[in-house]
């Protein structure tokens, strides 16, 4: 009996399979019956965008009755021989000798048919949307980028560490965290006093992590170079195309590293990941360029092969104010840059990716290193055309006295972070790191307008299916 062959392997090595007996399995995208007594079945197994055309003789004694039951959405296994295809759009086809029907799909109720469905509709059937061309392609791109992230850091001597999902620390200081508790939610007071916290599972307030950075610093100051890659959570009531309540972050931390070294690694990571996508996901990117964003491939090539522009926050504000552009959000020194400002810089001014450095001290969290001017911190944002910020990072404050001052300015209690201050008391060194959201990266690489399409199970305000 022939081994099961993936569709992608049949297309990649098509010459090797001509005349050979193979078995392919997957889900039926379409079936077309011709007047010549032949049925054409488009079979997809998820391994690639292309469908394998199965040619089935309607009078074949092995499966003639079975053919009537095969409709869009059915799961089948087909055994037969590979032959050159005379039709347009495919090089090979599978001439069926035997068909096994694993599972049927009633065409009267199966929601995916041969037409373009809106993304809003597909989100309502999240358990079936991976079977569409778009979400299948997104999944393959996401997989390849995730693997490439590990490759990048492993090849450069970073150690992969696992930081906690449940934490008592708020890295961002914004307070928008999901609380973890075993207390009775129906009778919990609005403000829980300390004695009630002590009755909780951990004996103190605990939350889902917003970042693994602080914990990663612990290991960077022992192993030198580390990274963490896992889910993070924000209880931010933002119902936009750029925000999720649950998403995946990659966060490297490097000892003996300043802002310049941080920038170097961040830019190298972006170039590496975009280069991998262009090389290894070409078919899927062609699909996105054709159906989602016509300028996608050109934008990706610009980011992969162009030098990054570097400007200070102060310079960026000056450029924006002098542009004469009518922005929705006013541009003033001390205000955070919005997506429209970031895109204007990369798309209209520099026409390539950019790094903005040295942000106002008041805008950034307590852990960022204060510059000598006392007004700015050694922070950086990496911006790309079409998206805006894709990476944010900084050199970390390694001086204990200034770190305590920063904490007090940001209303962070130093006594709650004694362990973090200890890292500055015992063998402190300059160190730096950054965070990159995987979904923001996948959204950029695929050109999809809404971030909810690039994560398998989007978590947003009012939505937590599955």
From Swiss-Prot:
Chemical reaction(s) catalysed: tRNA(Asn) + L-asparagine + ATP = L-asparaginyl-tRNA(Asn) + AMP + diphosphate + H(+)
Compartment annotation: Cytoplasm
UniProt key word Ribosomal protein: no
Transmembrane segments: none
UniProt EC number: 6.1.1.22
InterPro entries linked to this entry: Aa-tRNA-synt_II, aa-tRNA-synth_II, aa-tRNA-synth_II/BPL/LPL, Asn-tRNA-ligase, Asp/Asn-tRNA-synth_IIb, NA-bd_OB-fold, NA-bd_OB_tRNA
Entry GO CC: cytoplasm
PROSITE patterns in the record: AA_TRNA_LIGASE_II
Coiled coil regions, renumbered to chain: none
Biological-process GO terms, alphabetical: asparaginyl-tRNA aminoacylation
Record keywords: Aminoacyl-tRNA synthetase, ATP-binding, Cytoplasm, Ligase, Nucleotide-binding, Protein biosynthesis
Nucleus as UniProt keyword: no
Source organism, top-level taxon: Bacteria
Pfam family, one: tRNA_anti-codon
Subunit structure: Homodimer.
Descriptive protein name: Asparagine--tRNA ligase
Lineage of the organism: Bacteria, Pseudomonadati, Thermodesulfobacteriota, Syntrophobacteria, Syntrophobacterales
């Amino acid at each position: 009996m022939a081994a099961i062959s993936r569709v992608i392997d049949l297309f990649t090595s098509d010459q090797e399979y001509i005349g050979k007996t193979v078995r392919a399995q997957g889900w039926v995208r379409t079936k077309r019956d011709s007047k010549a007594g032949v049925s054409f079945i488009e079979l997809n197994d998820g391994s690639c965008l292309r469908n394998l055309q199965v040619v089935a003789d309607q009078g074949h004694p092995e499966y003639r009755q079975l053919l009537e039951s095969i409709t869009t959405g059915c799961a089948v296994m087909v055994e037969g021989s590979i032959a050159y295809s005379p039709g347009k759009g495919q090089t090979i086809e599978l001439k069926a000798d035997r068909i096994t029907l694993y599972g049927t799909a009633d065409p009267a109720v199966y929601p995916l048919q041969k037409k373009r469905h809106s993304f809003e509709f597909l989100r309502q059937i999240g358990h079936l949307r991976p079977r569409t061309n778009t979400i299948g392609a997104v999944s393959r791109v996401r997989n390849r980028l995730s693997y490439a992230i590990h490759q990048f850091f492993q090849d450069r001597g970073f150690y992969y560490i696992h930081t906690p999902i449940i934490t008592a620390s708020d890295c961002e200081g914004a307070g928008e965290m999901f609380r973890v508790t075993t207390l009775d939610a129906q009778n919990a007071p609005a403000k829980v006093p300390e004695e009630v916290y002590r009755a909780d599972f951990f004996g103190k307030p605990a939350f889902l992590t917003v970042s693994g950075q602080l914990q990663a610093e612990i290991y960077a100051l022992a192993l030198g170079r580390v990274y963490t890659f896992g889910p993070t959570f924000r209880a931010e009531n933002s119902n936009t195309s750029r925000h999720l309540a649950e998403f995946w972050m990659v966060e490297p931390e490097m000892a003996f590293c300043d802002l310049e070294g941080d920038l170097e690694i961040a830019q190298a990571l972006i170039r590496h990941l975009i280069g991998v996508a262009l090389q290894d996901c070409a078919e899927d990117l062609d699909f996105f360029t054709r159906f989602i964003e016509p300028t996608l491939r050109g934008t990706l090539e610009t980011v992969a092969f162009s030098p990054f522009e570097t400007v200070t926050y102060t310079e960026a504000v000056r450029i924006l104010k002098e542009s004469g552009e009518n922005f929705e959000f006013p541009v003033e020194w001390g205000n955070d840059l919005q997506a429209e400002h970031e895109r204007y810089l990369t798309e209209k001014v520099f026409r390539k990716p950019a790094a903005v450095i040295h942000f106002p001290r008041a805008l950034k969290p307590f852990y960022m290193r204060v510059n000598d001017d006392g007004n700015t911190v050694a922070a950086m944002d990496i911006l790309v055309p079409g998206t805006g910020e894709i990476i944010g990072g900084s050199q970390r404050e390694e001086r204990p006295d200034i770190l305590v001052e920063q904490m007090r300015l940001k209303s962070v209690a130093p006594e709650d972070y004694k362990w973090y201050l200890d890292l500055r008391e015992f063998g402190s060194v300059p160190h730096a790191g950054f965070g990159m959201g995987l979904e923001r990266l996948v959204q950029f690489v695929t050109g999809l307008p809404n971030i909810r399409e690039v994560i398998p199970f989007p978590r947003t305000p009012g939505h937590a299916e599955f």
